[in-house]
Design a protein with these regions (language model features):
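Short beta-alpha connecting loops at secondary-structure transitions
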Residues: 67, 169-171, 226-234, 249-258, ...
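Non-catalytic terminal/interface segments that mediate subunit docking, oligomerization
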Residues: 17, 30-31, 368-472, 476-483
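Short, ordered loop/turn segments at secondary-structure junctions
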Residues: 47-48, 73-76, 100-102, 141-143, ...
Length: 499
């Protein structure tokens, strides 16, 4: 059996299903190119039949990426497969990923069907997909809760029908590691012809066991893992690419390896976090802010003497360079451009000039500018295309006085001004915006997060608003909480006023 573990990245499909983290086609292409540079074997680019946006993204990613297989998801439905094949027409290496639910609950409640009918649909879908492409992956949705004997029948049948890869998803994140590993082992012991296909894992993190389950799958014979950058994904997320890659790199006694260039992990993690507006939790394994931080005096003493006393991973192995350029108000365009490019952010000269102007303003307030600061500045540049823009904002608040805010908006070139009071400066500023917009909008979620360490550092604000029964998300970043909040609120307003 091959000791190389293939990396199937589904950040752009399963990972993008997180509410508020949708990417446009340009952003998806940007991530896809970095995934190619990282060394992934397969990029699942989207679910083409689900929307014109996904269809177009698969087409454009197929054009932009050279050597990884480009995969398109479908249901076991002929039309889905037709559309997927069309979307993959420019891909150098095409894969169709089709499948159907196999657990008793899916068969009974989702499909109102029988085990035999589901088996027939699975075989038909694989054969139909093989008419278009040679590389067909079959997924047995909710395999984690599927009876092993029936699952083995399905796997054997789809391999005979032409499946080159068979995906065994723990769709609900229910399995225990030992249980999931035993399921993979059972398939290798009971499926005739299993050596003719690659067995793949796809684990969700609902009980915090996605990485452990994936590793047990590998130990028992799986040679493809389906993962996402930062573990992003529906509900509690998916297995994190960086965790599996570094587990295999650290535990060389397993004799298993990947083709991942681990030194590109950190920059891609930050890039995905920035483009998705989804912060990485500070204590996240491998890529979290605190992953290489030590607060205990005993730990600090040990690390200063020899890092191996408390660090099993060299930070440089994931692309963290202790000798990185320090950005200050004296830094020029070239330094800023270099630092952005190390995180996979490439801006036109015009946009770089605008980001540099904001960088200098921020640098006047802070002694040093960190990576999070410049990534926030680069991300906010995307807001320049909005037709509702904040010209100016003034908010006053203090002990014993009523918070007041005044604001000036530019709406498609027309100027508006308003003032309002509120329970605080943010509330007052939002009331002032509402006086101008005059649309029924309900603020349903409001989250403030400090990005860095100091009181003068950038904060990120995420807002969720409801308008006419639909949910819209907004994002803002600034060293000023009120400014960041209004930036997020206006960002959300631009989402539905553009429709």
């Amino acid at each position: 059996m091959d000791n190389r573990v293939q990396i199937f990245d589904t950040t752009l499909r399963d990972g993008e299903q997180v509410p508020g983290c949708q990417l446009n086609t340009v952003e998806k292409i940007q991530i896809a190119k970095e995934l190619e540079s990282l060394g992934v074997d397969v990029i699942e680019a989207g679910f083409p039949v689900s929307s014109p946006g996904d269809f177009n993204s698969v087409i454009e990613i197929s054009k932009a990426v050279t050597w990884p297989a480009i995969c398109a998801l479908t249901r076991a439905v002929d039309k889905d497969i037709d559309v997927a094949a069309d979307a993959l027409r420019y891909a150098k290496h095409k894969r169709i990923h089709t499948g159907i639910g196999t657990s008793d609950s899916h068969i009974k409640y989702k499909f109102n069907s029988t085990h035999e009918e589901i088996l027939e649909r699975a075989v038909h879908a694989v054969k139909y997909a093989r008419k278009y492409v040679e590389d067909v992956e079959f997924y047995a949705e909710d395999a984690g809760r599927t009876d092993n004997e029936y699952l083995a029948r399905v796997v054997e049948a789809v391999i005979k029908a032409g499946a080159t890869v068979v995906n065994i998803p723990d769709t609900t994140g229910y399995c225990l590691p030992e249980e999931y590993g035993a399921k993979i082992k059972y398939l290798f012991e009971h499926v005739d012809g299993i050596d003719k296909a690659v067995i793949s894992t796809h684990c969700h993190n609902d009980l915090g066991m996605a990485t452990a389950n994936t590793f047990e799958g590998i130990r028992n014979g799986a040679r493809q893992v389906e993962v996402t950058i930062n573990g992003v994904g529906e509900r509690a997320g998916n297995t994190a690419l960086e965790e599996i890659a570094m587990i295999l790199k650290c535990h060389k006694d397993t004799d298993l390896y990947t083709n991942i260039n681990t030194q590109k992990i950190y920059s891609l993690s930050r890039m995905v976090s920035n483009l998705m507006n989804m912060p990485v939790q500070p204590n996240k394994a491998i890529v979290g802010r605190n992953a290489f931080s030590h607060s205990s005096g005993i730990h600090q003493d040990g690390v200063l003497k020899n890092a191996q006393t408390y660090e099993i991973i060299d930070p440089k192995d994931i692309g963290l360079d202790e000798n990185s350029i320090v950005l200050t108000a004296r830094s020029g365009h070239a330094a800023l451009k270099y630092r952005l490019e190390t995180h996979g952010v490439n801006l036109s000269e015009e946009k770089l000039d605008k980001v540099y102007e904001e960088f200098l303003k921020l640098a006047d307030k802070k002694k040093e500018i960190n990576d999070d600061d410049i990534l926030m500045l680069a991300g906010s540049e995307r807001a320049n295309d909005h037709h509702i823009k904040v010209d100016w904002l003034q908010a006053t608040s203090g002990i014993g006085m009523k918070p007041v805010a005044s604001i000036g908006l530019d709406i498609s070139g027309e100027k508006f001004e308003a003032a309002a009071t509120g329970n605080g400066p943010v509330d007052a500023a939002i009331h002032a915006v509402r006086q101008i917009i005059k649309k029924p909008v309900t603020l349903t979620e409001f989250t403030i997060q400090g990005v860095s360490k100091g009181s003068d550092d950038t904060c990120k604000v995420h807002m969720q608003v409801e308008h006419n029964g639909r949910i819209y998300y907004g994002f803002g970043a600034s060293t000023d909480i009120v400014n960041a909040s209004i930036e997020a609120y206006v960002d959300a307003l631009n989402k539905f006023t553009a429709e």
